[in-house]
Design a protein with these regions (language model features):
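Conserved beta-strand elements of the Class I
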Residues: 225-229, 259, 287
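Serine-dependent acyl-ester chemistry module
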Residues: 19-113, 125-136, 212, 243, ...
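Sec-dependent N-terminal signal peptides
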Residues: 4-12
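Accessory beta->alpha helical hairpin/"wing" motif in late/C-terminal subdomains of nucleic-acid enzymes
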Residues: 147-149
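C-terminal motif of bacterial Sec signal peptides marking the signal peptidase cleavage site
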Residues: 14-17
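Membrane/wall-proximal cationic-aromatic binding patches
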Residues: 24, 29-56, 69-70, 74-77, ...
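Short beta->alpha junction loops
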Residues: 260-267
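Short, well-structured alpha-helical segments in soluble
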Residues: 273-282
Length: 332
């Protein structure tokens, strides 16, 4: 029981910050009537572990979410291939020790196998993190995101991944007329002090193109460009720009431009949409997806309707509704 409580506590601290910080991004606020009705009727969002623990119905829904994850990873691969960029999958999570959830244990091998099946290079970076405690690498007990020390450790994990891809290049270019004003979904030109409502102050700096970095990208490019896509693990709340792991990597690779396109709460769906609509115009040579097993559960319909970047309407299957009723009660 103690292990379960620790896991739930860690997950809550990690995702409470995610929900708060979502408001600091520029995401469309278009209202869709059908989607609004679904949000009103089905307001609860179960995490992946709750889905897995819901018996046969939960397993059926989790299998559905896994298929959606696999399909979306394939879509991301195709988008990367279309611009001549190499896509690498990395699994990264601050869940370690007693905080490791059932979804993490089951999700890691699935993601690795799915990536391999698509012919993608993949790295499980959770294994080397297992030697640390949550207090060593995160802001626990206040928050479950990376601490300054944890950010250094994460940067060290990504250093060999980027070094091994030193010669990777893409010849795809775009004209000034084709490029959008921003390549990321954060508000551009920010230099603001935030605390996420947790009294953990940090300075957020974004460039003129909506990425969490201080310098703007110029064209034509003269260096290899590495684009990191992901959620809060990439964005790194509660750390100043100089402390986040992408900035530390930039210091280690001065002949490479490291681009942080992370947005708190973003899913694999969102990352694919961001690449297609904006980020590809930054002309990346290497794209690193930062994912974790909880991203699988993000393909449940209530999560997608509530948080999806696209603001599309995701109509639930009968099995998804059955799970919702099982977890949260009947909806008339």
């Amino acid at each position: 029981m103690r292990k379960l409580l620790l896991a739930v506590s860690f997950f809550s601290l990690l995702h409470a910050g995610c929900e708060e910080k979502k408001t600091e991004t520029t995401v469309s606020a278009d209202v869709n009537q059908e989607r609004e009705e679904l949000l009103k009727t089905y307001s609860q969002v179960p995490d992946a572990s709750a889905i897995l623990q819901a018996g046969d119905t939960g397993k059926a829904v989790y299998d559905l979410c896994k298929q959606r994850y696999a399909d979306q990873l394939n879509a991301l691969k195709k988008e990367a291939e279309a611009i001549g960029a190499k896509l690498i999958v990395t699994i990264l999570s601050p869940e370690i020790g007693e905080s490791v959830t059932k979804s993490t244990r089951e999700g890691i091998p699935f993601i690795m196998e799915t990536a391999a099946g698509l012919g993608l290079e993949a790295y499980d970076l959770t294994t080397p993190l297992a030697g640390y405690t949550a207090k060593q690498i995160t802001q626990m007990p206040l928050d479950g995101h990376w601490s300054a020390e944890g950010s250094k450790i994460v940067a060290a994990l990504y250093q060999p991944v980027i070094a091994a891809a030193k010669g990777v290049t893409s010849s795809k270019t775009y004209t000034d007329a084709e490029r959008p004003a921003t390549f990321g979904d954060l508000d551009p030109n920010q230099d603001v002090a935030l605390d996420g409502g947790k009294n953990i102050p940090y300075q957020l700096v974004t460039n003129s193109q909506g990425l969490r970095m201080k310098t703007a990208l110029v064209f034509p490019k003269t260096k290899q460009r590495v684009l990191l896509l992901g959620d809060s693990q990439v964005y790194s709340p509660f750390l100043d720009n100089d402390q986040i792991f992408t900035s530390l990597l930039q210091q280690q690779f001065p002949d490479t431009e490291i681009m942080n396109a992370g947005v708190i709460g973003y899913t694999l769906d969102d990352c694919t949409g961001l690449l297609t609509e904006k980020a590809k115009y930054s002309e990346p040579d290497l794209i690193i997806l930062v994912t974790n097993p909880n991203d699988i559960g993000d393909f449940y319909f209530t999560q997608r309707n509530r948080m999806a970047r696209s603001k599309k309407t995701f109509t639930p299957t009968s099995t998804e509704i059955a799970l919702y009723q099982q977890l949260f009660g009947e909806k008339k």
